[in-house]
Amino acid sequence: MALTTDEEAKVKLIIQAFDNAKQIGDLDLASMDTAGQYVELYDSLTGKASRMLLSDAVSQAGAEWCGIRYKDAKTETEVVGSLSMLRQLPTLLNLGGYLVQNDHSRRKLSPKTHLLLETGEAAALDGTMGHYQWGWDKPFYYQNYKLAGYTYETISFSKRKGFWNYYIPVGSRSAAGYAVYDSATQSLKSVGTATVPVFNKSILTLQTAAHKNGDLWFANERVMNFVTGMLKRLIFHNRSIQTDFNANLTTDGLHQGGTGLGCSESYPWDNGYLPLNALVEDGDALEVGSFKGSTTNKDGTAKDIEYSAIPNFYGLKNDYKALWCMSENMLINCNEDGSQSLYIDDSVGKTLFNLNSLDGHVLHSRAPYNNEGWKYPKAYNMSHLAFWPSEDGGSQSTYFGDGYHNPGSKSGLRGVVLLGSGGDGDYAGSVYADGNDGVGDARVSWSAFLC
């Protein structure tokens, strides 16, 4: 069969390419300037071929990293770094349930059910075997930086050369979402039974109660809150963690979506009934769960309740849009122009953070709002493992999708209320912040996670 003119031309090009081909040993030596030079890569899991800048390939080989990047002016979030590492990140970190002693020693719970230890023995979640916690058991580094118009959030297991590396030690927080108050010891405990979480106590009381467990125990600590949200952003490669849950993986084998809007029902304090930890016992799952239980009124009247759409992030249940949590180490100063500035400490230590004064604290940043009302920020300052609004222009369905409330006050100190309650809807989430309340305030809709 005769070839067409176009086919003959293509064959000639193939022959020409073959004749001009060189063995590796015949190639010219490359210059030491690697700018613009690429190497070819092949992903054995997806079968895809791709290219990478040589400088990035060398960086990955020396210190593998993964993460996301996004432009503050655009809603899309992109994956960067090692796809393989991001796919395996929950396993590499060993995310899941733990029983943690006051000295921070820990035993991993079974990823299939938190009623068993990973070794197969029965696990008591009532506090007798340790605090029922969720967390990770491998330290890592976090990098947050701007480059070519993008904000990057990345993690690695060794320091990345040329970047500021935040060291994240082994950590954990209340796996059921919230801690309970032990009146006998006046301390916070994490349990996994369907009990009433601590509520209607000020952060000053909660802070002291958490620290009674020993060194480096906190209530609603800012770094733990930040890291939880950051891990969700990376694993879902999505800034808005309240995006609908999607059990399907992408073609690259990555998770997508988020952990959902949050609990479908407000906790029943509005009718005088005690709130209840909505326990989900199905291990280190990534899903949206449900819960049925019974609670009581102050007069002893019982009420059956049912919650659905409960986030379960590898064993961390109901961690937002259920009960508000005021941070024990974030402090707001209300400025004369009506804006609010966030103050933190450079490091997290063994001493109590003073919530009654700015003395000794460090200015983190100032929010771009000076009028009263709920806002949806487009961007945040995320230095020092804390977040604070840096740019207006978001919405409930774009960018981070979380709310910030400025009371418009022109003087005074305020606490930072995190995460949102069951009635907050779209405002709630990992970078939700309400700056309306004083540090001595207490509400029935406020609680604490122990970390």
Region roles according to the model:
Residues 1-30, 449:
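Short, intrinsically disordered N-terminal pre-domain segments
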Residues 28-43, 315-317:
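Short hydrophobic/aromatic-rich beta-strand motifs
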Residues 40-60:
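Short, surface-exposed terminal/edge motifs of secreted or surface/virion proteins that either
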Residues 43-47, 140-142, 177-178, 224, ...:
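Acidic glycine-/aspartate-rich tracts in secreted/extracellular proteins
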Residues 62-194, 292-296, 312-313, 421-422, ...:
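Short acidic-hydrophobic catalytic motif
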Residues 66, 226, 248-281, 323-331, ...:
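C-terminal, surface-exposed recognition/capping segments
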Residues 124-131, 155-319, 448:
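Short aromatic-cysteine micro-motif
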Residues 178-201, 339-365:
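A solvent-exposed, charged loop/short amphipathic helix patch at secondary-structure junctions
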